[in-house]
């Protein structure tokens, strides 16, 4: 039974729609395998479709080409090569030259005409002297400006400057024949070679460096322990809490806020006694010896009695004299207020 591709496709689509309406999902390979009829239809459809593809030749769709003069667009190209703005034949001061092909054709035509003219008519002696070289020379000469001509004449120049845009043809031909760069030949070595690096045998291994690091860490720990042991413990209350480690706090130096005063220690009883004058004591001893020599009685008190009298007598206490007036100037000194004629260095507030 010969069937068309469209007929096979129609049967397959009808069955698929019926399957979707029944099961609410498209058919899978597992659903097609048990159905031999549908399996054959799928195979037949694939065979017919492959035959159609082979029969129809593939035609590439090409855009029609337009025969137009070459124009440099936003991405300028010339002879199939990308051209930069510095390589384009664009110059505001010069007009484009005539192409070389037209010049060569003009030269050949003029040569042929001159030869025919020489054969047909006997030209004058001046015309006979003119040859091919004279014709070429006359063509390449710069045209002279006439009164009616308004455009600028372009001289025929064979050599161009290094930055001239008219060197495009030369640069393109050079680029087309570039070769891959080759390594240069071995250059002769310099006469003086650098001095070799000295080997340092004193360099340490990783194991030695790690061992030194551990030693440094242990030394730092020992110093920290010594510093902690030197901290003076603060005593609270009676001397019972001296051994507690919790009371050990490092002493902090208090910041000096006021005027420095000398520390006054409590004087002992021995220091509070009046010191004896040596000169007076010597005079007493001399007078006592003289009286003993003369046989006179000494009615003066002894040294022990004098010491007892001195101890019994209380020392005079110095009393502060009351100030006469509570002057306002005291506030200047106490509060360090600025005065008119004082030195600004002293008595400043901190």
Swiss-Prot record:
<feature type="compositionally biased region" description="Basic and acidic residues">
    <location>
        <begin position="290"/>
        <end position="299"/>
    </location>
</feature>
<dbReference type="GO" id="GO:1902977">
    <property type="term" value="P:mitotic DNA replication preinitiation complex assembly"/>
</dbReference>
<dbReference type="GO" id="GO:0000727">
    <property type="term" value="P:double-strand break repair via break-induced replication"/>
</dbReference>
<comment type="similarity">
    <text>Belongs to the SLD2 family.</text>
</comment>
<feature type="compositionally biased region" description="Acidic residues">
    <location>
        <begin position="102"/>
        <end position="111"/>
    </location>
</feature>
<keyword id="KW-0539">Nucleus</keyword>
<dbReference type="InterPro" id="IPR040203">
    <property type="entry name" value="Sld2"/>
</dbReference>
<dbReference type="InterPro" id="IPR021110">
    <property type="entry name" value="DNA_rep_checkpnt_protein"/>
</dbReference>
<dbReference type="GO" id="GO:0003688">
    <property type="term" value="F:DNA replication origin binding"/>
</dbReference>
<dbReference type="GO" id="GO:0006270">
    <property type="term" value="P:DNA replication initiation"/>
</dbReference>
<feature type="region of interest" description="Disordered">
    <location>
        <begin position="97"/>
        <end position="128"/>
    </location>
</feature>
<protein>
    <recommendedName>
        <fullName>DNA replication regulator SLD2</fullName>
    </recommendedName>
</protein>
<dbReference type="GO" id="GO:0033314">
    <property type="term" value="P:mitotic DNA replication checkpoint signaling"/>
</dbReference>
<feature type="region of interest" description="Disordered">
    <location>
        <begin position="290"/>
        <end position="350"/>
    </location>
</feature>
<dbReference type="Pfam" id="PF11719">
    <property type="entry name" value="Drc1-Sld2"/>
</dbReference>
<feature type="region of interest" description="Disordered">
    <location>
        <begin position="52"/>
        <end position="73"/>
    </location>
</feature>
<keyword id="KW-0963">Cytoplasm</keyword>
<keyword id="KW-0131">Cell cycle</keyword>
<feature type="compositionally biased region" description="Basic and acidic residues">
    <location>
        <begin position="118"/>
        <end position="128"/>
    </location>
</feature>
<dbReference type="GO" id="GO:0031333">
    <property type="term" value="P:negative regulation of protein-containing complex assembly"/>
</dbReference>
<comment type="function">
    <text>Has a role in the initiation of DNA replication. Required at S-phase checkpoint.</text>
</comment>
<keyword id="KW-0235">DNA replication</keyword>
<dbReference type="GO" id="GO:0031261">
    <property type="term" value="C:DNA replication preinitiation complex"/>
</dbReference>
<feature type="region of interest" description="Disordered">
    <location>
        <begin position="234"/>
        <end position="255"/>
    </location>
</feature>
<dbReference type="GO" id="GO:0005737">
    <property type="term" value="C:cytoplasm"/>
</dbReference>
<feature type="compositionally biased region" description="Basic residues">
    <location>
        <begin position="333"/>
        <end position="350"/>
    </location>
</feature>
<dbReference type="GO" id="GO:0003697">
    <property type="term" value="F:single-stranded DNA binding"/>
</dbReference>
């Amino acid at each position: 039974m010969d069937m068309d591709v469209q007929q096979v496709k129609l049967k397959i689509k009808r069955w698929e729609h019926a399957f979707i309406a029944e099961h609410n999902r498209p058919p899978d390979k597992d659903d097609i395998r048990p159905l031999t009829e549908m399996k054959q239809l799928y195979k037949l459809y694939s065979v017919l479709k492959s035959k159609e593809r082979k029969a129809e030749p593939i035609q590439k769709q090409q855009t029609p080409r337009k025969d137009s003069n070459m124009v440099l667009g936003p991405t300028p190209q010339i002879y199939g090569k990308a051209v930069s703005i510095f390589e384009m034949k664009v110059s505001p001061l010069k007009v484009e030259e005539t192409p070389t092909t037209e010049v060569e054709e003009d030269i050949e035509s003029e040569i042929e005409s001159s030869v025919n003219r020489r054969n047909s008519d006997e030209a004058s002696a001046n015309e006979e002297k003119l040859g091919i070289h004279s014709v070429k020379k006359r063509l390449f000469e710069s045209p002279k400006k006439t009164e009616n001509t308004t455009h600028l004449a372009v001289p025929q120049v064979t050599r161009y400057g290094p930055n001239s845009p008219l060197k495009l043809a030369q640069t393109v031909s050079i680029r087309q024949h570039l070769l891959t760069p080759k390594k240069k030949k071995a250059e002769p070595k310099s006469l003086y070679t650098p001095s070799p690096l000295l080997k340092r045998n004193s360099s340490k291994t990783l194991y030695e460096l790690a061992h030194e690091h551990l030693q440094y860490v242990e030394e730092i720990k020992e110093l920290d322990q010594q510093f902690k042991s030197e901290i003076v413990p603060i005593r609270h209350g009676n001397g019972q809490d001296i051994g507690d480690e919790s009371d050990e706090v490092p002493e902090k130096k208090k910041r000096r806020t006021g005027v420095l005063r000398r520390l006054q220690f409590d004087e002992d009883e021995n220091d509070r006694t009046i010191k004896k004058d040596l000169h007076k004591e010597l005079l007493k001893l001399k007078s006592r010896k003289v009286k003993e020599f003369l046989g006179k009685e000494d009615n003066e008190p002894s040294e022990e009695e004098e010491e007892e009298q001195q101890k019994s007598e209380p020392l005079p206490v110095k009393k502060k004299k009351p100030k006469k007036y509570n002057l306002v100037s005291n506030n200047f000194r106490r509060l360090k207020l600025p005065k008119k004629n004082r030195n600004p260095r002293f008595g400043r507030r901190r």
